[in-house]
C-alpha cells in the first residue's frame, strides 16, 4: 500500500491564509495523493473550509492557534512574538517531533527560514541551508539552488549544494543520475572566482556516483535545460530567479499588446489561441510553485505568498513527492559519503593550496534588515 505522507500545513500563511491554503490542500487531494494533513491555525477560520471540503476534513487534524506570523514581520520579531505558538512555528515543530514528514507554508520567507533554522538546525556537515527552486526550461524542468538563502559560498558549500540538488532532482524530476553544472561566467575551466573553480575541481575528483557533474554552465543554460541541476550561491541565484520572473512577465505583456493592437492582430490571435494557451501554461509560474529549504534536519516547502489555490496545490504536491522519496534520508547518506571521500582525497583543497575559508557570518543574507 502506498505510504501516507503527513504534511504539516501552516493554514494562516501567505497573503490569503485559509482562503487559499485549504482549498489548495483539497485540490491536491483530488489528484489521488495519499496525504494526511496536520492543519495549524485559527479553528474559527479553518472549520468553514473543512465543512466545504469533506474529503480534506476526513484526512485532516486541526491544531488550534490564533497566532500567525504577518507577511511584514521581521524574522527576529517573529521569533520573539510567535516562536512557540504561531501556526508557522508549530508546523515546523511538527516535523522536528516526527509528527509530520514535511511542512508547507506560504508565509514570510525571512521568518520561515529563521524559524526553520532555529527549530530544525542544519544537518551535520552543512554550514547553511539553501533554497532550491524548480525552473521551467525548454527541455522540461531544472532544479536551481541556492536562490536566496545566503550570500557567498566556499567550495565545500557548493559541493554540498550539488549533492542536495541532485537528491531533489531524483525525487521531483524522477532522474536517476542527474546532470549537475556550476553557474559561472563562462564554460571554460579557467574562468570564474577561485571558490567556484575549486568546487569544480572537487566535484571532478570525487566523481560522486549519485550525480553526473558536467562542468560550468552559463546563465542561458538554465532556460535551455542544459543540466538537471544548476548550482550557485544565493546572491547570483536570487538575481537569476528575479530576472527570469521579470522576463516572463515582460514577454507576456509584449504578447498581450501585440495581439490586441488591431483587427488583424486579433484575428491572428483567434487562430493561434491553442498554441498560445500551451505557451501560457509553459510559462505559468504556478506550475513550479514551491521553494524547498534544503540542508536542514527536516524539509520545509515555501509556497509563494501571492499564490492562488492551484499554485498552492502544486507546492503541496511537490512536498508530497519529496517526502515519498525520503529526500532527507537520501541527502544525509549522500553527504556522509561525500565527506568520507573528501577526507580521503589528498587534493581536497582549493586551487590556491589552502582550504576554502568559511563564509563569514556577516556575508550571510540579511533578511532581518
UniProtKB/Swiss-Prot annotation:
It is found in: Cytoplasm. GO terms for molecular function: phosphate:acyl-[acyl carrier protein] acyltransferase activity. Its EC number is 2.3.1.274. It catalyses: a fatty acyl-[ACP] + phosphate = an acyl phosphate + holo-[ACP]. This is Phosphate acyltransferase. It comes from Methylocella silvestris (strain DSM 15510 / CIP 108128 / LMG 27833 / NCIMB 13906 / BL2). Keywords: Cytoplasm, Lipid biosynthesis, Lipid metabolism, Phospholipid biosynthesis, Phospholipid metabolism, Transferase. NCBIfam families: plsX. The keyword Mitochondrion does not apply. Pathway: Lipid metabolism; phospholipid metabolism. The gene is plsX. Homodimer. Probably interacts with PlsY. Residues 342-369 are annotated as: Disordered. Catalyzes the reversible formation of acyl-phosphate (acyl-PO(4)) from acyl-[acyl-carrier-protein] (acyl-ACP). This enzyme utilizes acyl-ACP as fatty acyl donor, but not acyl-CoA. The lineage of its organism: Bacteria, Pseudomonadati, Pseudomonadota, Alphaproteobacteria, Hyphomicrobiales. Transmembrane segments: none annotated. One of its GO terms (cellular component) is cytoplasm. It is an enzyme of class 2 (transferase). GO terms for biological process: fatty acid biosynthetic process; phospholipid biosynthetic process. It comes from the Bacteria.
